[in-house]
Amino acid sequence: MNFEHTDDRRMLADTLVRALRDGYPIETRNAGAYGETGYDPAVWQQLSELGIVSALFDEAAGGFGGSGFDIMVVFEALGRALVVEPFLGALMAGRALAKAGEHDETLAGIVSGETIAAFAYDDGMTPVTATESGDGWMLSGTKAVVSQAGAASVFVVTVEQDGDPLVLLVPADTAGISVRSFNVVEGGAAGDVTFENVTLGADARVGGDGQGQAIVDAAVGAGLLALSAEAVGAMEFVKEATLGYLRDRKQFGVPIGKFQALQHRMATVLLEIEQAHSAVINAASAFDGDDAKARERALAAAKYTIGRTGALVAEETIQLHGGIGMTWEYAVSHYAKRLVMIDHQLGDEDYHLQRYIALG
């Protein structure tokens, strides 16, 4: 099996890494991440114009990529720079629409970066319900911690029903929708989206009868792969930063990297990162396959591995830096927070371990 990237994919990765290295230092990232909107619209526009969102979708959806390895390459680069712009929402909402083969105008806006989309998946304390109203539906309830909910102009909303989930495309300015926005601990913004007797027409539905679960699986599967790849990119950054610190920081007249105890701890970190990277490569390979069960198992394995490894890498790299690793000004502290919080998106390591076993 050949896991080497194509020339086009290498070019995409090089372009994105270079753009982020030159134009997205940690100070720029933090200014947007901890600001009112949780991201920088100018950065989003710049990266969209480079075709980064388009790389996440195939030609049928208006993009030029869309494979599992395309998603992996893009999100590894985004994770390495700790990007907070709303790529995950674009990927998941866009994948749902593309899987259904509907709402082409909205999908085109998402792929071009002109439309900010959010995938409203996890229910809050008041689960979202949809009751039939005429030819359409009436939505009530709350979706919790929806990434970039305040900036989104459109939501793709999932509603659990007996037999098959209902998926709906809902403009953010629809009467009855309210968003309580907030910054999240690792940087970026999210919001609780409340639907109060929101009336939708029949054209709001994404997909037909019996298609709901496949649409949700397509969106969530892409999200799991993206988060796992993002974590690998973040781990690669903190690995390099920590190795540099061990070489430069001196104690008793020698670099602390000469101390065997620290060498052993760093060696463990390196091995765990390689194992996590392998799990993500396996998931990216299975993502485009015809075997749905193998794909879901590979995604569950990757997300489980990322959750376990991400926490270890965050803790160890902070410990190896000492006090400076916790400071706001030092980038590693922000990466550590993100690595811990990735585990809690779309199911944590315990959930995905149980899921992997169940799929076996």
Annotate the PLM regions.
Residues 1-81, 136, 218-360:
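Alpha-helical interface subdomain recognition
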Residues 125-140:
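Cytochrome P450 C-terminal beta-domain/meander region
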Residues 126, 145-146, 171-208:
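Flexible, small-/acidic-enriched active-site or ligand-binding loops
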Residues 120, 142-177:
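A short core secondary-structure module
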Residues 83-102:
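N-terminal glycine-rich flavin-associated loop
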Residues 106-108, 127-129, 143-147, 156-160, ...:
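A generic local secondary-structure boundary/capping motif
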Residues 112-123, 157:
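A short, Trp-centered hydrophobic/proline-enriched beta-strand micro-motif
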Residues 20, 74, 119, 157, ...:
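Residue-level signal for inorganic ion chemistry
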